[in-house]
UniProtKB/Swiss-Prot annotation:
This is TDP-N-acetylfucosamine:lipid II N-acetylfucosaminyltransferase. One of its GO terms (molecular function) is fucosyltransferase activity. It catalyses: beta-D-ManNAcA-(1->4)-alpha-D-GlcNAc-di-trans,octa-cis-undecaprenyl diphosphate + dTDP-4-acetamido-4,6-dideoxy-alpha-D-galactose = alpha-D-FucNAc4-(1->4)-beta-D-ManNAcA-(1->4)-D-GlcNAc-undecaprenyl diphosphate + dTDP + H(+). The lineage of its organism: Bacteria, Pseudomonadati, Pseudomonadota, Gammaproteobacteria, Enterobacterales. Pathway: Bacterial outer membrane biogenesis; enterobacterial common antigen biosynthesis. One of its GO terms (biological process) is enterobacterial common antigen biosynthetic process. One of its GO terms (cellular component) is plasma membrane. Keywords: Cell inner membrane, Cell membrane, Glycosyltransferase, Membrane, Transferase.
Length: 361
């Protein structure tokens, strides 16, 4: 059986903690590993992640130090295999491209952002070119249906498998009916973070054109840190279009329960990112019967359509009647069978890890 080492190669606390807790709390019980799953993790706050006793974890304080350790391990033991969860570490892509990490050692669960090329800055355009070259050398790619479609268009000869991120979900939260708001005013959730990929200002203009200034807008911008300049730009644009009392720009990180309460108050989600992201928030909205608008360039719509989840596309006509009908359709869905919901994605992980460990061809 192949020695398998899981790699979280960038310091993304929320996502990394979700993966680690999923392995520690769920997969260890579901699969019954012969040995503790091995993880190599970048983090500046070990205490946040170091509560998974069922895992064998090695921590690194930088992307560079982790990459050096991965490369050293790959070169010293060509029979070991790495399962990269997401991949925002330039050094690891370059190691794959140069052959320091071999194709059969590099299995990858793509998280969306690392497939797409948003920035126009010269240094990023150069990196995108090198990353495209490296991605054709991956041994096996796991991703959502839409991202597999995108990847296979560029690299048709690389083996792929469907796999969903282990979104933190509680099936008991799924509601059967929605309570109408007393004042009848629509509440719209704009974006899933303060990242520029949400295209907040463009979305604000589109929302104003569709609904005027008589809707409530909630914009969560607590993540990423040190983002005040962009937050100010979004706030200025929002105030030029909507009344202050109809705006709620959240500038701090929220506790998970507070975030759930916020989502329950919404009537519509608006996500303009031109790539797959925000699946966690989308899953929660589906649980709460809240429809949403996506960019057609966010290929997760393929997964949604496959699971019969109603989707609005940015640029299409939209009014309160269409939204109410989408809410009705969403509430009538059997949400217990949606493939990317917990616990349904567990079987995909069982199969993926069996393949990666050489137990399944």
């Amino acid at each position: 059986m192949t020695t398998l080492i899981h790699v979280l190669g960038s310091d993304i606390p929320h996502h990394n903690r979700t993966v680690l807790r999923f392995f520690n709390d769920v997969l260890v019980q579901e699969i019954g590993f012969l040995a503790k799953p091995k993880f190599m993790v970048v983090t500046k706050n070990r205490a946040l992640l170091d509560d998974c006793p069922a895992l064998d974890m090695a921590f690194f304080d930088s992307k560079k130090s982790l990459a050096q350790a991965v490369i050293a391990q790959a070169c010293s033991d060509r029979d070991c295999r790495f399962f990269f969860h997401g991949q925002f570490n330039v050094s690891l892509w370059l190691a794959l491209l140069s052959g320091k990490i071999k194709r059969h050692q590099f299995w990858w669960h793509a998280w969306g952002a690392d497939l797409y090329e948003d920035s126009q800055q010269l240094k990023f355009r150069l990196f995108y070119f090198l990353r495209r070259l490296a991605q054709r050398r991956v041994g096996h790619v796991f991703a959502v249906r839409g991202d597999l479609y995108f990847y296979s268009q560029h690299h048709p000869n690389v083996p792929t498998s469907l796999l969903y991120f282990p979104t933190r979900m509680e099936p008991a939260l799924t509601i059967a009916e929605r309570v109408p708001v007393e004042d009848g005013k629509m509440t719209i959730l704009l974006g899933n973070s303060g990242d520029r990929s949400n295209r907040h200002i463009t979305a604000l203009k589109v929302i104003h054109k569709q609904f005027g200034d008589k809707v409530r807008i909630i914009i969560p911008m607590g993540y990423p840190e040190n983002n005040q300049v962009y937050i100010n730009q979004v706030e200025q644009a929002a105030l030029s279009l909507f009344r202050p009392e109809n705006l709620n720009i959240i500038k701090q990180n929220m506790a998970f329960d507070d975030y759930l309460a916020l989502l329950r108050r919404c009537d519509l989600g608006y996500f303009m990112f031109n790539r797959q992201q925000g699946i966690g928030t989308i899953c929660l909205l589906i649980q709460f019967g809240v429809p949403f608008v996506l960019s057609r360039q966010n290929l997760f719509w393929r997964d949604l359509i496959e699971q019969q989840v109603p989707v609005f596309f940015a640029g299409n006509p939209l009014d309160s009647q269409l939204i109410a009908e989408a809410q009705r359709q969403m509430l009538s869905l059997d949400r217990n069978v949606i493939a990317f919901f917990s616990p349904n994605f567990i079987d995909g992980w069982r199969q993926a890890l069996a393949k990666a460990a050489g137990e399944q061809q």
